[in-house]
Amino acid sequence: MELFIPRGTEKSAALAGIKKLCVAAHEDDIELMTLGVLGNMNPAEFAGAVATNGASSPRTGRFAGVTDEEMVLLRAEEQKKVAEAAGYGALALLGYTSADVKTESRAAVEKDISELILATSPDEIYTHNPADRHPTHVAVFCRVLGAIRSLPPEKRPKKLWGCEVWRSLDWLPGAVRTVVDSEKGTELASTLLPMFESQVEGGKRYDEAYIGRQRANATFAESHSTDEFACASNILDMTVLITNDRLDPCDFLYDVIDMFRRETKKTLDGAMK
């Protein structure tokens, strides 16, 4: 695990000041998940961690000939530049492959994450939600949950949040969905996301997609009222998974989906009568 402290801040002081930690699967996932949160806080109190090395990134254009080995170095450098520009308190690059995170090195990944949690003592952790379409994202969610559950209760964060990337969360019932004002984060996105040149110039316009999603979340949040926010992020409250170790994450997600099922059935039944 490589630990990068932006701005040359002394390591122990930087880690001691962390209040919110985001653990992501890939470089740029930190920003896609939590720019809305970051825009509303002191960035020096924020730390990001990237589980995989980015070797399998899609590529085209001027990046079409980049090898996997070169892409690993390139994506790490891009993430460091973004952390520096945003003013993060700390950035951890775990450097695993997707296969490591999914199966081969689960224990090692969870150990690294648990050590990072102990080093930073965050009040809140943000990661991928278990309904994400990307298998590596779901695997990182599982590794984060395993890492937290390996710690004694007094060493755990107070909150665990699941964020949007490869599936929007506007479908979540209100009981488990938190809406974050992401207007300031969307302003940050215009500056930070284009810095991931290997992605936005290599075939994936994450910068434009992120901004579009935030605006859509805000506008389509309520059909019978004016917009509360100009931009919004939807996040899933998963805290119950770290206060009740016996709760299976599948059962947790099925309960959320069942809430959605009941909500939509009630609306449809009412329209059919």
Predicted regions located by residue number:
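Metal-dependent de-N-acetylase/amidase catalytic core
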Residues: 1-21, 103-273
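ATP-dependent adenylation/pyrophosphate-handling site
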Residues: 16-70
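Short acidic/polar active-site loop segments enriched in Thr and Asp
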Residues: 44, 89, 123
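A conserved beta-strand->alpha-helix junction
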Residues: 51-53, 82-97
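Feature marks short, surface-exposed loop/turn motifs that line or immediately flank catalytic pockets
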Residues: 54-57, 100, 169
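Alpha-helix N-cap and loop-to-helix initiation/capping positions
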Residues: 66-74, 104-108
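Short, surface-exposed alpha-helical segments at coil->helix boundaries
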Residues: 72-80, 141
